[in-house]
């Protein structure tokens, strides 16, 4: 092994295996592009993005870490979201949750 070397298993690496997903349509109603990163709590994204927001509590984009999706003005895209793993506690972002999601999620 070389110092700093990373040895990965052979074959494809699957992300978010076994986690609940949701597909939704998202429209950018604003006049500027909006980019959403892979780990951003989707419920708290820019208000110019129009979608069924209540359904997205506790989810983020189901895309590889470090990537993002860009919504141009007037664009409508279908995206796949995945549940956030862990303790179901969300802090930061736009400060809309700042605590536990338990009891705050709306059923699909």
Swiss-Prot record:
InterPro entries: Urease_beta-like, Urease_betasu_sf, Urease_subunit. It comes from Microcystis aeruginosa (strain NIES-843 / IAM M-2473). The lineage of its organism: Bacteria, Bacillati, Cyanobacteriota, Cyanophyceae, Oscillatoriophycideae. One of its GO terms (cellular component) is urease complex. It is found in: Cytoplasm. The gene is ureB. One of its GO terms (molecular function) is urease activity. Gene3D superfamilies: Urease, beta subunit. Keywords: Cytoplasm, Hydrolase. This is Urease subunit beta. Its EC number is 3.5.1.5. Heterotrimer of UreA (gamma), UreB (beta) and UreC (alpha) subunits. Three heterotrimers associate to form the active enzyme. Belongs to the urease beta subunit family. One of its GO terms (biological process) is urea catabolic process. It catalyses: urea + 2 H2O + H(+) = hydrogencarbonate + 2 NH4(+). Pathway: Nitrogen metabolism; urea degradation; CO(2) and NH(3) from urea (urease route): step 1/1. PANTHER family: UREASE (PTHR33569:SF1).
